[in-house]
Regions:
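M16 family metallopeptidases and their MPP-like homologs
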Residues: 61, 66-81, 87-90, 104-197, ...
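Bacterial N-terminal signal peptides
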Residues: 28-37
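Boundary at the C-terminal end of the N-terminal hydrophobic targeting segment
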Residues: 41-44
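Non-catalytic, conformational "gating/processing" segments within enzyme and secreted inhibitor domains
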Residues: 204, 208-212, 226, 230-231, ...
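Catalytic Zn2+-binding segment of zinc metalloproteases
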Residues: 93-103
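Bacterial N-terminal signal peptides that target proteins for export
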Residues: 5-28
Length: 496
């Protein structure tokens, strides 16, 4: 089937495959409070689940309102499984370079050159002498030129486009790697064939050029003047855990990539029992299974090594972390805490608490201090890792002579209002409604719903997680918010 598809199109054009996925949250104005009391469902239809014979999990969310499907393959493998090496991210790039049948005019002739390139990268990783390294790099360059004679750049993307595909992309996080795109439902056979094929027999071609792309990405991040401070905070917060190293890899590791290590990473984690397929849109789950068994069912069966959660350091005994920000005149302070994880019974109350601090309408407790000029700006943030949820807030005093101590005091005064229940009932209901409305809108859009299900699969929350969360949001009371806010007290670990 794949060979037939390839023969239909042989067009090459330059494209970039990697893009960090951005998840957007939509908020409504407080006028929607007038609609309180009406029913609301977090999802438009239930998710249908089944497992292929090789252990691969399939979640299908049908939505026949538009003729499109959003498909995502989720691998529970990311930066935490290769700390500091950047292998998960490197491999994500390689997955767009084709297979033994896609992206090549003659794989049998190409393979010896690719094997030689892999061996040279292994040699480079073990060589410290600069002169010898330069010789190896030059040899790799000459081998890459020879191998390039057989490569067809961008063929995978072109095939996806030929068969109704768009938005082709991927991303790597600490906990997962996700490959996704939108496609027309009449091409589901071709989509399944192409996407399963690259998960069975990826070929590590055109690596030298992709290495340069990753370096450019690293340099792009390095151009951010706040990056050094962010990386220092990351090492401090997560020391002793797989989350302390940069996701893209350390500079030293990036200089010594090994294709053989990427192959081992693929063999270890890209197995049926460690992968999920999410399909949202105009598909019929009841008729899909035979097709998926013929395509994704070909992926090698197996389970990945068990992940062990490493405890975070005890932040309560750590000193304040002092960071230098390269912004003249501006001072900033903040706090970072552990938050309730995604399936924690207090999760819904925690989300309401964060919304009461700051929201799109700028009516939160921290927002009010910005609106009235008590400080320049403030914002709470929360982020969910597979193992932990972090909650934090940063604040900036008035410029140029605002006091950081005063801003700190104002911050805790607002937190105290949460702990003491000094919140208007309508503000509580508005926060709940806003969060529920976001869940509802996510359920109405194939891409947003897919994003929710990708996260739920990766973090092992279950496909019913959005509904579970919506049910608990409806039940949140002010007493729940007070209880959840109580642990956040002055004197715990700070960032400034």
């Amino acid at each position: 089937m794949v060979t037939k598809l390839i023969k239909l199109i042989r067009i090459a054009h330059l494209s970039s495959y990697f893009c960090t996925m951005k998840r957007k949250i939509f908020f409504l104005s407080f006028a929607i409070l007038l609609l309180l009391g009406t029913g609301m469902s977090a999802q438009t239809s239930p998710v249908k689940e089944f497992v292929l014979h090789n252990g691969l999990t399939v979640w299908v969310a049908e939505d026949h309102t538009q003729p499109k499907v959003f498909g995502a393959v989720v691998v529970r493998a990311g930066g935490k499984d290769c700390p500091g090496t950047g292998i998960a991210h490197y491999f994500e790039h390689i997955m767009f370079k084709g297979t033994d049948r896609i992206g090549t005019v003659d794989y049998a002739a190409e393979r010896p050159w690719l094997d030689s390139i892999s061996a040279e990268y292994d040699k480079l990783a073990k060589t410290a002498d600069p002169v010898e390294r330069l010789k190896i790099q030059r040899h790799i360059n000459s081998l890459s030129i020879k191998a390039g004679d057989y490569a067809i750049p961008n063929e995978f993307e072109n095939l996806i486009s030929q068969y109704g595909g768009s938005r082709l992309n991927a991303y790597t996080s600490f906990d997962e790697t996700v490959y996704h795109n939108e496609f027309a439902p009449q091409y589901i056979v071709q989509w399944c064939t192409l996407n399963s094929d690259r998960l069975i027999s990826p070929v590590f071609r055109l690596f030298q050029g992709e290495l340069e792309t990753v370096y450019e990405e690293k340099n792009m991040y390095s151009d951010n003047p706040l990056l050094p401070a962010a990386e220092t905070a990351q090492r401090f917060l997560f020391r002793g855990t797989p989350y302390e190293a940069p996701l893209i890899g350390t500079t030293e590791q990036l200089k010594n990539p090994q294709l053989s290590e990427m192959r081992r990473f693929f063999d270890t984690y890209y197995v049926g029992g460690n992968m999920g397929l999410i399909l949202c849109g105009d598909v019929k789950a009841d008729t899909l299974r035979p097709l998926l068994e013929r395509t994704f069912g070909r992926i090698r069966a197996g389970v990945a090594p068990e992940r062990h959660r490493v405890p975070l350091p005890d932040w309560s005994i750590l000193p304040t972390l002092k960071l230098k920000l390269p912004i003249p005149v501006v001072k900033a302070g903040g706090y970072v805490f552990r938050g309730p994880e995604e399936r924690n019974p207090d999760r819904a109350a925690f989300m309401v608490m964060v919304n009461l601090l700051s929201n799109k309408q700028q009516t939160g407790l921290l927002d009010s201090l910005s609106r009235t000029g008590r400080w320049m700006a403030a914002m709470p943030l929360s982020y969910d890792f597979g193992d932990y949820t972090l909650f934090g807030a940063g604040f900036v005093p008035k410029i140029p002579f605002g006091s950081l101590k005063k801003a700190d005091r104002l911050f805790w005064q607002q937190i105290s209002k949460l702990r003491n229940g000094q919140i208007a009932p309508q503000a509580l209901e508005a926060a709940k409604w806003e969060l529920l409305r976001t869940l509802e809108k996510n359920g109405e859009d194939a891409i947003h719903r897919s994003n929710e299900l990708v996260n739920a699969y990766s973090h092992q929350l279950g496909s019913d997680y959005p509904d579970w969360l919506a049910d608990r949001l409806r039940q949140v009371t002010m007493a729940d918010v007070e209880r959840v806010a109580r642990p956040y007290k002055e004197g715990v670990w700070a960032l400034s």
